Amino acid sequence: MKKKYRIPKASVIIANYNNAKYLRNCINSILNQSYKNIEIIAVDDKSEDSSLEVLKKYKKKIKVIKNRKKTSKGSYNQINSYYKGFIKSKGKYIFFLDSDDYFKKKKIELVIKEFENNENLDLIFDLPILKFRDKEIKKKFKQKKFVISSWPRFSPQSCISIKKKLAKEIFKILKLKKFETIWLDFRIAVYYFLKNKQIYIFKKYLTYYRQLNNSASKDYKILNKNWWYRRKQAHEFVSFLNKKLKLKDKMNFDKIMTNIVNLL
C-alpha cells in the first residue's frame, strides 16, 4: 500500500518595522495563496506607527512576535527578527518576506513544487517584480561572471525560500552582529555560493518588491561614501566566510579598488 503524500508545511516569516501602510497587503497576499498548508509568523521590531493595531486584527490567523528591545546594528535588526520567527517556525520550507513586499497568489505552490521535484535543491531565489510608485518592472536576470567581484547576482530578501535544515545551518553561522551594512539576502547568497559554487534562480516573477523613497538602500547611492563603505564590508564578509569554510581568500580588482577608496 502506497504511503499517503502529506503536503509539506510552509512557514512565511514577515519582518516588520513601521510598515503599517503596506502590512495588510503583505499579510493578505499570504492568506490568499493557492497553497493552503501555511503558517504565518509576523515579527514586529518595536514599530512606532500603527503596525501593532494592524497585526491585532489578524491574531486568529497569524502568530505575532514582538521584539521587546530594538537592536541598534543596522541590518541586524531585520536579521534578528527573521531569526526569532525562524526558531518558532514548524514548516519544512521557510519563506522570508519584508512587510512592504508581497507574494503572487501561486508563489508558494510553485516554489514548493520546484523543491519537491528537485530533492537536491535547498535554496531558491525567485525573481522580483519591482514596484515603484504606479509602475511595475520586470528586469531580465543575467548571471554575471566573477572576474570583477567576489559574489553572485541574486534576488532580494523577499524572494528567498529555503529548507529549514539549511536555514538552521545559516543562522548558526551568519546571525552575528558584525557587518552592520550587510543584509540577510547577501549573507545567504554568498554563503551558499561559496559552499556550493552556485545558487538556483527560479526564473519566475513571483514577488512584488517595493522601491520606497525611505528605503535604506537610498543611503547607498552608487559610488557615494556609504556605498564604498558597504562594499568594503561586503569584501570583509566574503573573507570571513572563506575562513569559516576553509577556502582560499582571493584578491581581485574590485577588492583592491574598494580598499584604496576607503583609505581616502
Language-model segments: which ranges?
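Cell-envelope/extracellular polymer assembly enzymes that use nucleotide-activated donors
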Residues: 8-11, 29, 39, 187
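Short, well-formed alpha-helical segments that are part of the catalytic scaffolds
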Residues: 19-32
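A conserved acidic beta->alpha catalytic loop
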Residues: 44-53, 69, 98
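Glycine-rich, basic loop-to-helix element that forms the pyrophosphate-binding segment
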Residues: 68-89
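Short aromatic/hydrophobic "clamp" motif used to bind/position activated sugar donors
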Residues: 94
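Conserved donor NDP-sugar-binding/catalytic core segment of glycosyltransferases
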Residues: 106-137
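Conserved nucleotide-sugar donor-binding catalytic segment
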Residues: 126, 145-222
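Catalytic core of nucleotide-sugar-dependent glycosyltransferases
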Residues: 148-149, 207-213, 218-249
